[in-house]
Swiss-Prot record:
Recorded family membership: Belongs to the universal ribosomal protein uL6 family.
Organism of derivation: Arabidopsis thaliana (Mouse-ear cress)
Residues modified as Phosphothreonine: 75
GO molecular function, a single term: structural constituent of ribosome
Protein name as annotated: Large ribosomal subunit protein uL6z/uL6y
Xref: InterPro entries: Ribosomal_uL6-like (IPR000702), Ribosomal_uL6-like_a/b-dom_sf (IPR036789), Ribosomal_uL6_a/b-dom (IPR020040), Ribosomal_uL6_CS2 (IPR002359)
């Protein structure tokens, strides 16, 4: 069965400007600018004004959509909400080094754009991970064996964490016993809400 029209709207904060052009959404805020392409989705994007409050809203329509297309409306809204959160508050992921015997040494180079991991499970191999665009990495001052990744795009920050995590993957051993690695310990925003 097809639904004739399913649509949803979301409020846009005053500190953020949004441009919609041919399913490409550009969000600009105090922390910078992010662009996302929704051309693969069969949806209509419009910027509207609320008649009562006069606030800007983003409206997404799906004409004659199947259940999958109707479900993609909510997905697109969530992506745009993440873009708005990114340009207003930013995303921060904290990762901790976990080791039983051999302490993991990590040195951050390239102005916070890459990390080199040494002495993982006592190996001599140096593992180098480049951060994705717009993601910076620093060592935590307060907590020992912790690194902090900051960025505006949640997908790039979380993918950078995944790259670090995958570099420290234990091979040819029982991972229930050998728990060494670098794991995400906390996810938060850079600018906390008052």
């Amino acid at each position: 069965m097809k639904t004739i029209l399913s649509s949803e709207t979301m409020d846009i904060p005053d500190s953020v400007t949004i441009k919609v052009h041919a399913k490409v959404i550009e969000v600009e805020g105090p922390r910078g600018k992010l662009v996302r392409d929704f051309k693969h989705l069969n949806l209509d994007f419009q910027l509207i004004k609320d008649p009562e409050t006069g606030k800007k809203k983003l409206k997404i329509d799906s004409w004659f959509g199947t259940r999958k297309t109707s479900a993609s409306i909510r997905t697109a809204l969530s992506h745009v909400d993440n873009l708005i959160s990114g340009v207003t508050r930013g995303f921060r992921y904290k990762m901790r080094f976990v080791y039983a015997h051999f302490p993991i040494n990590a040195s951050i180079g390239g102005d916070g754009k890459s990390i080199e991991i040494r002495n993982f499970l006592g190996e001599k191999k140096v593992r180098k991970v480049e951060m994705l665009d717009g993601v910076t990495i620093v060592r935590s001052e307060k907590v020992k064996d912790e690194i902090v990744l900051d960025g505006n795009d949640i997908e790039l920050v979380s993918r950078s964490c995944a790259l670090i995590n995958q570099k420290c993957h234990v091979k040819k051993k029982d991972i229930r016993k050998f728990l060494d690695g670098i794991y995400v310990s906390e996810k938060s925003k850079i600018v906390e809400e008052e």
